[in-house]
Curated annotation (Swiss-Prot):
It comes from Clavispora lusitaniae (strain ATCC 42720). GO terms for cellular component: cytosol; Golgi apparatus; membrane. It is found in: Golgi apparatus, trans-Golgi network membrane; Prevacuolar compartment membrane. Its main location: Golgi. GO terms for biological process: Golgi to endosome transport; Golgi to vacuole transport; protein targeting to vacuole. Pfam families: Sortilin-Vps10, Sortilin_C. The gene is VPS10. Residues 1503-1525 are annotated as: Disordered. Residues 1514-1525 have a biased composition (Basic and acidic residues). The chain crosses the membrane at residues 1346-1366, 1400-1420. This is Vacuolar protein sorting/targeting protein 10. Residues 1504-1513 have a biased composition (Acidic residues). Belongs to the VPS10-related sortilin family. It is a multi-pass membrane protein.
């Protein structure tokens, strides 16, 4: 019986195949000039629109015939958009221009409409476009206007609306919004838009969600705390969920993201899914009314595909659970028409890219495909049925590369036929496209059968009963010459030979897959730039027979592979009727969707979810949510609450008998969730590493993102985190890692191994490339020298590079390690110099080369390809590259003196001149502390005795050549590190420790400078300690009692500093108050803090602590560094108050405390030793991200009304709030505003330089060869004088002048103006160079210069005088006529000739000259008389003459005397009245013998203009005065 049945089945199958082979579809084709842009079906119709080159055409018979749309015309760059609701409507948008087109009858007729963009956008192209139905005839259109290449991603969004189905031109929506959506959750649809308010700097300072029912004639704002604080970046309607995506930090696009969800369209709650928007990707997937599905990107780089995590929510949309990790974000899709079935690709855990897995510069991804039939709760790999070499039990499965049937404008769909899927992929776990084959599934994707040996495109017709397949290419990678089709659901295939072979572009049928007609578009190879359009018609297969009920079979969706039973989702299971595969008929229900039957299921645990007061744990159990319970207690004001742990999923259809089997009520005491028991918003995470901590580093992967953290232990293991230390993965390197280097470019990391390979990452250790080393690291140490700006270039140095050895070699790569070229042999060190010095030669490289027992400095501008190596310096010790300078330490010929040379251009080196009394022995070292465009700070060792190491800090001039002493006896350690710190953000504030010898070793004291090292002072101690007790410093000078801080040489991590790179003015350090700095283990050691840039300090807490700054100083965190501890202290108000929190279950030994280098993160990590194992390290991640309820508001236009205030640093000796010659103001969070975080708020844009101050002594430092004496003045060093200065400077070649120094030079950072100029230099000529000096300063007196400077001005002057005399005096009667002019008679007697404007100007000049001459003469005579009177008074006091007599000056009455009759011997006239003293005393003495005053006083002396003629006459001849001795 079984045999007979098998034979019948085989016969029927063969018969079907023969019949299929005999059938051939009806096919038409046409060739179209140019390559088409798009081809699409209108929904539920046979109408097809085709966008070709410079034309748009329609077919109304499934692609058989075509008609060009004349209304649209010859448009060359257009976009087609279908209305998502109205299936009859579609749009044609033109990228260029403002005329667009619309159809309301599926393309039969078209009409134009115009959209007028803003004037500022008229020159842009149309990018993305979206269409929303609002209500009735209302249409909302979103258009993006984008800049042209290469700025095509810079787009501005505009929304337009029409209330009459675009019968008239749409209008601009009266709201400036980038995001709008139609909210259909309400009874009446409304438009929701995001409205941003920006300041003058372009920053979003406010973001609000506004709603309108009348196209924003009126609107209302929807309130939610998350909206007010952050920035809303997206609003969308997903099934029954209205979702608002908010960026927590308005000023950082990569900041954490929160999701707020509404089910009623009005009220929102914040979901518990918060994540870092580090890679700009959150993708919402097709969702059900019961659950919201989305993926969140975890990493991306230009060399790898984006990957992330798949999440689903509960029925409220507020609580999310993780479904799948490492998901390929481009290949995750829900299977259409079936609830709960998902297909996804995941990346393998191994982040190592092997050399053979790299092609075309990109890695072949290791991925695998998975399927879930229970909404993502469980996942299975895909089984292949007809491949014995790939069995699921052996770990082999199908890896689909693509499984979509139609790409419907950015939406992947699996096909319209339930349970029938098709796609291409490979066996194994790689994504090698060239090895792909095509597979088909008839059970919804659980099992697959190979049907073709290559990849191609496919489409389904008649609910899967017709399948067309077109390979991407034919033989030898040429065009496809045939298409394949199946009429029995893929069991057998027919072939049709194409009349015109082509490379297929699109294969389409009706959108619901119910038609038996298809349209294929492809590129024709032999026709230049042409497209072929094929129309296939299978309707006559099976003689047009329509299926009967007997031809159909019932098929269940989601059949479990374990027991063969259908799986229930949301309380129901689904089935549908499908044609039997061997039936010879068509369903022929065109435009009719597949009917799905629903059957109710009994309720199970899967139909329940956690109640609102519980949350899902990592183990999948509902546990109490303290935050929600606290809110419930507060709202109901009860002592106890009974709350259920679970509830049935909303809209679940399961058959429910009782909740008791699944729901448990728990009683809670509200006192446990209120008051001090309120749960903390600070989260603590814990990780453990094998081995002891040996190296760690943060790696920046974006401009404002440094959350990637790499940890290495002494076992050679590497652990990596991309979320700030919250979680780690061990990177599975096969080799032991010796160490790693982090490059200056974003994401660049190199791992050095003991073997013949190394690993390189370009995305912050998310993935690594494995490469061969140029020389094995086993030969010696390896050094990597990165290019400062080119991320693909670095230099590899390896080998035994000791002096006398020749095994060290330098190699260069330009492709980040894929290949190397040899640079130079015997190189100990190499560096790229050009980017540092910013010179035109972009390839300048320096190398320290070993040559026998000497080291030389080699340079090259073409990677040492010269015939001979150029050595710029022969005998060097080392070189240091700092910004704008390269400093080289050299030895003299006798090796008795260490010298330094400096270059600013990379080619010319200048000698470094130390102060004349500063001698350096050959074995003495110097350390380049730092450099800037203004100067170099250098520490020169003066005592290298073990245990007594110290030296002097020298500071250079602007070109790095001349140095002055800044501070003596500065402490250093045995390896050359110096107790020196420059405080971040503050200009020129330095801290250093000096040392003096003692029996115990060193006595160290801390000094601070507020003027860039010109002046140093001890730090004034606080008045009281942290317990309120007074320090015993009263009455003592600072030299005997001051604050001392442990410096750079005593830090366990040299990256720790007193100050922060972002918290301006905040300083923290460990130390003590007293005469000297005590050992760190001393009981007096405590933590001290300054909030004003080091002016004043206070003690925080006794003990020794690690410290760090978070969020630009809004969080200060300290943890005990000496004793085991399980808690840390933190401050949220800049150190005003401190709180304590536990981070560990038991005390641990803290090794270090760290956060991102910029101190802008709210995440910290605490490294600690493990008590359980002496060979492991613990890490505790402390996260304050949810600690602050809001972001601080900043209003740079009105700073007094926001959360910030201005703070001004100042010099302690200044009363003008000045530092470096100017008053500067920095923005800091205001006191009392400690409920907000700063984030990436651009505080630097609020920086103000209020004014430049007048220059004072604080703006100057001692000049070269001068030192600061105890009295604060600058004096010449011993043995130097001005002659030394002349001889020293003039002996240099090419020098013709020297300067007489004042001993002072202006500090380069100072911008002061005016005031006292301490540095006013006077140039002097070097002996024998007077001529060059005079020429340089314009002092040579050649004949030509004399002529130009003297004779030409005189010639011009006399010419002008003669012209005025000729036109203004001689022509008007000469000087005799002018002598008649009276100052008090106006111009009645003077009527000059005025024939033109020149005469007017000349005559006015003459008048003015007369008045000026008269007044000047009178003043001159008065001054002479006063001077004579003063002389007489002095002589009278000395020789007995008596004061009291008044002297008067006679002023001539008539101006004619000024010019004609005045006595020329005016000295005699003055002497006539010189015998009387002019009394100028304020309080004259009393005398007993007085003389009578003269009867006739000439009062015109004091009021010339008011005198009458009578007065003048009476005063003309006064009587002689008598004098009594």
């Amino acid at each position: 019986m079984n045999l007979r049945a098998s034979c019948i089945a085989a016969f029927l199958c063969l018969l079907v195949q023969l019949c299929a082979a005999d059938f051939s579809p009806e096919v038409t084709h046409r060739i179209v000039k140019g390559i088409g842009w798009d081809i699409s079906y209108f929904e539920d119709s046979s109408n097809v629109i085709h966008v070709g080159e410079k034309m748009v055409e329609m077919s109304y018979d499934d692609g058989v015939t075509w008609t060009e749309i004349e209304t649209i015309g010859k448009s060359s760059d257009i976009l087609v958009k279908f209305d998502p609701i109205n299936v009859n409507r579609a749009f044609v948008f033109s990228r260029i221009g403002d005329t667009h087109f619309v159809t309301d009858d599926k393309g039969k007729t078209w009409r134009s409409f115009k959209v007028q963009p803003k004037k500022s956008l008229k020159d842009r192209e149309l990018g993305m476009h979206h269409v929303f139905n609002f209500k009735d005839d209302s249409v909302l259109i979103k258009l993006e206007y984008c800049k042209q290449y290469p700025e095509a991603d810079d787009c501005d969004v505009s929304y337009f609306y029409s209330s009459n189905s675009l019968k008239s031109d749409p209008q601009l929506l009266p709201i400036d919004a980038k995001v709008c959506v139609v909210n259909t959750l309400l009874d009446e649809p409304t438009i929701l838009c995001v409205k941003d308010t920006r300041n003058s700097f372009g920053h979003v300072v406010k973001s609000e969600l506004v709603s309108s029912k009348d196209l924003f004639k009126t609107s209302e704002s929807i309130k939610h705390p998350g909206f007010d604080s952050g920035r809303i970046i997206d609003v969308r309607l997903e099934s029954s969920f209205l979702v608002v995506v908010t960026q927590k930090d308005r000023f950082n696009e990569l900041s954490s993201i929160s999701i707020s969800v509404s089910k009623d369209g009005k009220t929102f709650d914040t979901a518990d899914l918060a994540f870092q928007m580090a890679y700009g990707a959150i993708r919402f997937l097709p969702s059900d009314p019961q659950s919201l599905f989305l993926t969140v990107a975890a990493s991306t780089s230009k060399d790898t595909r984006p990957q992330g995590t798949l999440y689903s929510s509960d029925s409220s949309g507020l609580h999310f659970k993780k479904l799948l990790d490492n998901v390929d974000l481009g290949y995750s899709a829900r299977v259409e028409y079936v609830h709960g079935v998902w297909l996804a690709k995941t990346f393998e855990e191994d982040p190592i890219v092997e050399p053979n897995d790299d092609y075309f510069g990109s890695p072949i991804a290791k991925t695998s495909s998975h399927i879930s039939i229970d909404n993502g709760l469980t996942w299975n790999k895909l089984e292949i049925l007809n491949d014995d070499s790939c069995k699921l039990k052996d770990g082999c499965s199908l890896n689909l590369l693509r499984f979509d049937a139609i790409e419907d404008k950015n939406k992947y769909v699996t096909g319209p036929t339930p349970n029938i899927l098709m796609g291409f992929g490979i066996t194994g776990n790689t994504d090698n496209f060239f090895k792909a084959k095509t597979y088909i599934s008839r059970d919804g994707g659980l099992t697959w059968t190979n049907v073709f040996s290559g990849p191609g495109i496919h489409a389904f017709g008649d609910q899967g009963n017709v399948i067309m397949y077109v390979p991407f290419s034919g033989r030898n990678h040429g065009p496809a010459t045939e298409v394949r089709y199946s009429l029995n659901q893929g069991r057998s295939w027919g072939t049709y030979k194409l009349k015109e072979p082509c490379f297929p572009q699109e294969l389409i049928t009706t959108t619901d897959g119910t038609n038996t007609k298809f349209v294929l578009s492809g590129i024709v190879e032999h026709q230049q730039m042409s497209e072929v359009l094929y129309a296939f018609d299978f309707s006559k297969a099976f003689d047009g027979n329509k299926c009967k009920d007997s031809d159909m079979e019932k098929v269940y969706a989601r059949v479990s592979p374990k027991d063969g039973q259908p799986n229930c989702i949301y309380g129901f299971k689904e089935s549908f009727m499908r044609r039997k595969a061997d039936a010879r008929c068509f369903i022929d229900r065109t435009f009719e969707d597949v009917k799905v039957d629903v059957e109710q299921c009994p309720c199970t645990q899967q139909d329940y979810e956690c109640s609102p007061y519980f949350k899902l744990s990592e183990k999948g159990v509902c546990v109490p949510d303290p935050k929600k319970i606290a809110e419930k207690c507060k709202s109901e004001s009860k002592d106890t609450l009974k709350l259920p742990d679970m509830q049935i999923v909303a809209e679940n259809k399961c058959e429910q008998k009782s909740d008791s089997s699944f729901v448990t009520e728990t009683e809670f005491k509200c006192k446990d969730f209120t008051g001090e028991n309120v749960p903390s918003s600070i989260t603590i995470g814990q990780s453990e590493f094998d081995g002891f901590l040996s190296q760690y580093s943060y790696v920046a992967t974006g401009p404002d993102l440094s959350d990637n953290l790499i940890v290495k232990t002494d076992t050679g293991l590497i652990y990596a985190s991309n979320n700030g230390g919250t979680s780690f993965v061990r990177v599975p390197f096969k080799e032991k890692i010796r160490g790693f280097y982090v490059g200056p470019s974003l994401g660049r990391v190199i791992m050095i191994t003991d073997g013949d390979v190394f690993y390189a990452s370009n995305n912050g250790a998310n993935t690594f490339y494995k490469y061969k080393v140029p020389t094995s690291a086993s030969n010696g140490d390896v050094t990597i020298s990165f290019h400062p700006t080119d991320e693909s270039r670095f230099i590899w140095l390896s080998g035994n590079c000791a002096v006398g050895s020749s095994t060290c070699v330098a190699y260069h790569t330009e492709d980040f390690g894929r290949s190397f070229e040899k640079l130079i042999d015997n190189a100990m060190a190499c560096d790229y110099v050009s980017p540092v010095l910013d010179i035109t030669s972009t390839e300048l490289i320096y190398c320290t080369v070993v040559d026998g027992n000497k080291k030389k400095l080699a340079s090259s501008t073409n990677y040492f390809k010269e015939a001979e190596i150029e050595y710029v310096l022969d005998d060097i010790v080392a070189y240091a590259i700092k910004s704008n300078f390269v400093v080289v330490a050299t030895l003299d010929e006798a090796h008795t003196m260490l010298k330094a040379k400096v270059t600013a251009d990379g080619f010319v080196f200048a000698d470094v001149d130390f102060p004349s009394d500063f001698k350096i022995e050959a074995q003495t070292a110097f350390t380049i502390l730092e450099s800037s465009p203004h100067s170099i700070f250098m520490h020169v060792t003066t005592d290298s005795t073990s245990g007594h190491e110290k030296g002097a800090i020298l500071k250079s001039n602007s070109n790095g050549t001349y140095y002055v002493l800044s501070l003596s006896d500065v402490n250093r350690n045995e390896v050359g590190y110096v107790d020196y710190d420059r405080l971040g953000l503050l200009e020129g504030v330095l801290i250093a420790n000096t040392a003096t010898d003692s029996k115990e070793g060193k006595n160290k004291k801390t000094q601070i400078s507020f003027n860039d090292g010109s002046q140093w002072n001890y730090i004034a101690p606080p008045a009281v300690d942290s317990d309120g007790k007074e320090y015993a410093c009263k009455g003592q000078p600072l030299s005997k009692c001051s604050l001392h801080l442990h410096g750079f040489t005593e830090r366990p991590d040299y990256r720790d500093t007193f100050s922060s790179g972002s918290a301006v003015g905040l300083l923290i350090g460990m130390g003590n108050v007293g005469e000297y700095l005590k050992p760190v283990t001393d009981d007096q050691t405590a933590a001290f803090m300054s909030a004003d840039g080091g002016l004043t300090w206070k003690e925080i807490k006794k003990g020794v602590y690690h410290w760090d700054f978070g969020d630009q100083g809004t969080i200060l965190l300290l943890v005990d560094a000496a004793k085991d501890t399980d808690e840390f202290i933190f401050s949220k108000d800049e150190g005003a108050t401190w709180e304590t929190m536990k981070f560990a279950s038991s005390p641990v030994k803290v090794l270090d405390l760290a956060t991102v280098p910029s101190d802008t993160s709210l995440k910290f990590v605490i490294f600690a030793g493990s008590h359980q194992s002496q060979s492991s390290t613990q890490l505790f991640a402390v996260d304050f991200s949810q600690f602050f309820p809001r972001q601080c508001q900043v209003d740079l236009e009105n700073p007094e009304s926001d959360d910030f205030e201005y703070w001004t640093p100042m010099h302690p000796e200044s009363t003008e709030r000045c530092l470096f010659g100017h008053e500067a103001m920095y923005l800091r969070r205001a006191a009392g505003h400690d409920d907000c975080f700063i984030g990436s708020t651009p505080l630097d844009q609020g920086y103000k330089m209020v004014r430049n101050c007048t220059c004072t002594r604080n703006d100057y430092e001692c000049d070269y060869n001068y030192f600061r004496d105890n009295d604060g003045t600058c004096k010449l060093v011993k043995g130097m004088n001005a002659a030394n200065r002349m001889a020293e400077m003039c002996r240099k070649p090419g020098v013709f002048e020297y300067f007489e120094p004042t001993g002072y030079r202006k500090i380069p950072l100072s911008t002061c103006v005016g005031g006292k100029q301490f540095d006013a230099l006077k140039p002097r000529a070097c002996p024998g160079h007077e001529k060059e000096f005079n020429e340089a300063h314009g002092r040579d007196v050649g004949g030509s210069k004399i002529f130009i400077l003297i004779f030409i001005p005189l010639l011009v002057f006399f010419s002008a005088v003669f012209f005025v005399y000729d036109r203004g005096i001689r022509r008007n009667g000469g000087f005799q006529k002018l002598g008649q002019i009276r100052l008090d008679d106006g111009d009645d007697d003077f009527n000059p000739i005025e024939e033109n404007i020149v005469d007017v100007v000349v005559n006015k000049t003459v008048r003015g000259a007369i008045v000026v001459a008269a007044g000047t003469f009178a003043v001159f005579k008065t001054i002479r008389k006063i001077d004579r009177a003063m002389f007489d008074k002095v002589t009278s006091l000395l020789f007995g003459r008596r004061p009291g007599q008044r002297n008067y000056v006679r002023v001539p009455d008539d101006e004619d005397e000024l010019f004609g009759t005045f006595d020329e011997n005016y000295e005699d006239e003055l002497n006539e009245a010189a015998d009387v003293d002019f009394n100028v005393d304020e309080e004259p003495e009393e005398f007993t013998e007085l003389t009578a005053e003269p009867a006739n006083v000439d009062e015109r002396l004091f009021d010339i203009d008011d005198q009458s003629e009578d007065d003048a006459v009476s005063a003309e001849h006064p009587e002689p005065e008598s004098t009594h001795e």
